[in-house]
Design a protein with these regions (language model features):
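Membrane-interface capping segments at transmembrane-helix boundaries
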Residues: 20-24, 199, 325-340
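Extracellular/periplasmic helix-loop-helix junctions in multi-pass membrane proteins
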Residues: 298-316
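"…together with the soluble PPM/PP2C metallo-phosphatase catalytic core" -> "…together
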Residues: 1-249
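N-terminal hydrophobic signal/anchor transmembrane helix of membrane proteins
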Residues: 227-231, 313, 317-334
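Cytosolic, membrane-interface loops and tails of multi-pass inner-membrane proteins
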Residues: 19-45, 251-283, 341-345
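A helix-boundary/kink motif common to multi-pass secondary transporters
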Residues: 93, 151, 280-281, 308
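Alpha-helical transmembrane segments of integral membrane proteins
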Residues: 277-295, 299, 303-304
Length: 346
């Protein structure tokens, strides 16, 4: 009942706060202008992550004690909010943003949110030792950027994040965790309320303010939950729960390297672009990705309770199916054919 109460409270807060943020965004010129590479056909409020941040943070202390983990999440989350706001307003350079993400990760590590070990499938643990900090930084920054890159259509990042974090919630409950499931439902409720205004046609975008904050909290949830478990399959759980954004980002990097393009260069090869290319409208493409994410989340939940060798077979099979599907969609190509590139909502 406590988790349900937390979800409902953050949901209501998000529903109340988001319209206020929409008005403030227009007033303070936190808006996204229409453009050739943009999905919006009119000026749209951005920095919507502020609403998600407030809906998450306001009740946080009522449901969880102010221990080191929560302090780190509050301080680091606020830092990520500020970084996102600066980027949404001034479009700061990628290197500066990357350094900011590393600083955000180091804040969590300073307060004890770190990956100290990986469960050894053959028994015991593999302690990371001096590699704890770089491994944790890599994980946090990677999750931040995967959520950031999947934020390409109305409601896409928010919906995928809800599914991923609810998967981590279910797994954390299985493992009798305390902090991770509460963080998960607080974030899920915040995103769910925001989604009402972010789903197509969007009245507000989450911006980097939202995508970086959400990615940051999801990373914290995975570290304090699934990755703290003694189960041998723990590493597979967050990777499957976040498989859509993780694989989409991985494919983007591979696509750009093999085509001699800068890794940070935008293109039309992401999964949502490819779904639009085969004739789907925005809503259909987004819902299709939701369904894929939900299936992968269900698999992540199921394998958490089975033997490692069986889980490994399932995990590898899923990855191979994803790669096959990506190839069929043409995700490894660089650009979409012009005739299939319309972002019109038909």
């Amino acid at each position: 009942m406590l988790y349900l109460a937390a979800f409902i409270i953050t949901l209501i807060l998000s529903l109340i706060i988001t319209p206020v943020v929409i008005k403030l965004s227009h007033h303070l010129n936190f808006v996204d202008q229409p453009g050739v590479r943009k999905i919006n056909k009119k000026v749209t409020a951005t920095a919507g992550g502020t609403a998600i941040f407030l809906a998450f943070m306001i009740p946080l202390r009522f449901f969880l004690p102010a221990n080191q983990t929560i302090k780190g999440i509050m301080i680091g989350g606020t830092f990520m909010l500020i970084l996102g706001l600066l980027d949404d307003k001034f479009e700061i350079s990628a290197p500066i943003k990357f350094v900011g993400q590393i600083i955000g990760a180091l804040i969590l590590i300073y307060y004890g949110v770190k990956i100290n070990f990986i469960t050894n499938p053959f028994g015991g643990f593999i302690y990371l030792g001096i590699y704890t900090v770089p491994f944790t930084v890599f994980w946090i920054v990677s999750i931040i950027n995967t959520i950031n890159l999947i934020d390409g259509l109305d409601g896409l990042a928010a919906g995928v994040s809800i599914i991923a974090v609810l998967t981590l919630f279910a797994v954390a409950l299985q493992e009798n965790q305390v902090i991770a499931p509460m963080l998960a439902v607080l974030l899920a409720g915040s995103c769910f309320g925001f989604l009402k205004y972010n789903f197509n046609p969007a009245k507000i975008f989450m911006g980097d303010t939202g995508s970086m904050f959400i990615g940051y909290i999801i990373a914290a949830v995975s570290i304090t939950g699934a990755l703290k478990s003694a189960a041998a399959v723990t590493i597979f759980v967050p990777m499957l729960a976040l498989a859509v954004p993780i694989m989409d980002t991985t494919f983007a990097i591979i696509r750009r390297i093999f085509n001699d393009r800068p890794i940070g260069e935008a293109d039309h090869g992401h999964i949502h672009h490819r779904l639009l290319a085969i004739g789907m409208n925005q809503k259909q493409a987004v819902i299709s990705v939701y369904v894929i994410s939900a299936i992968l989340g269900t698999i992540a939940f199921v394998i958490n309770g089975i033997k490692f060798d069986h889980a490994l077979i399932i995990f590898v099979s899923v990855i191979l199916i994803i790669i096959y599907g990506a190839k069929r969609l043409g995700i490894f190509s660089v650009e979409l054919p012009q005739e299939g590139c319309s972002l019109e909502d038909s």
